[in-house]
Curated annotation (Swiss-Prot):
Gene it is expressed from: rplN
Record-linked InterPro entries: Ribosomal_uL14, Ribosomal_uL14_bac-type, Ribosomal_uL14_sf
Keywords for this protein: Ribonucleoprotein, Ribosomal protein, RNA-binding, rRNA-binding
Taxonomic source organism: Protochlamydia amoebophila (strain UWE25)
Family per record: Belongs to the universal ribosomal protein uL14 family.
Presence of the UniProt keyword Cell membrane in the record: no
Any GO molecular function: large ribosomal subunit rRNA binding
HAMAP family: Ribosomal_uL14
Subunit annotation: Part of the 50S ribosomal subunit. Forms a cluster with proteins L3 and L19. In the 70S ribosome, L14 and L19 interact and together make contacts with the 16S rRNA in bridges B5 and B8.
Name listed for the protein in its UniProt record: Large ribosomal subunit protein uL14
Length: 122
């Protein structure tokens, strides 16, 4: 569960290392974001030769959360980190590689490019 001021680890090679969420998209009263949701974030830490710099405002899609994801078949899944991938306005990832597994819910939300770049979809 991601909310305002949550810090996320970036799991792609766009140049950002950490981002801080400052708006969950999807309505004025929406407070929490889960796997597959889009949030607006600010880059807190970045590689010096990356395509994004510290302080840039970016859109990210959440691919892993520490809180449980409950599925329709009754299983629960959770990850060690809160992670995200930077995306552009057309919902394509800014990076060319994704590190670590991605939850199946990302593919169900029509982020097919992200799930195809991921080494593993859980």
């Amino acid at each position: 569960m991601i909310q305002q001021e949550s810090e996320l680890e970036v799991a792609d090679n766009s140049g950002a290392k950490r981002v801080k969420c400052f708006k969950v998209l999807g309505g004025s009263k929406r407070r929490y974001a889960h796997v597959g949701d889009i949030v607006v974030a600010s880059v807190q830490d970045a590689h010096p030769e990356g395509s994004v710099k510290k302080g840039d405002v970016v859109k990210v899609v959440i691919i892993r959360t520490k809180s449980y994801i409950k599925r329709k078949d009754g299983t629960k899944i959770r990850f060690d980190t809160n992670s995200c991938v930077l995306i552009d306005d057309k919902k394509n990832p800014k990076g060319t590689r994704i590190f670590g597994p991605v939850a199946r819910e990302v593919r169900d939300r029509d982020f097919l490019k992200i799930s195809s770049l991921a080494p593993e979809v859980i």
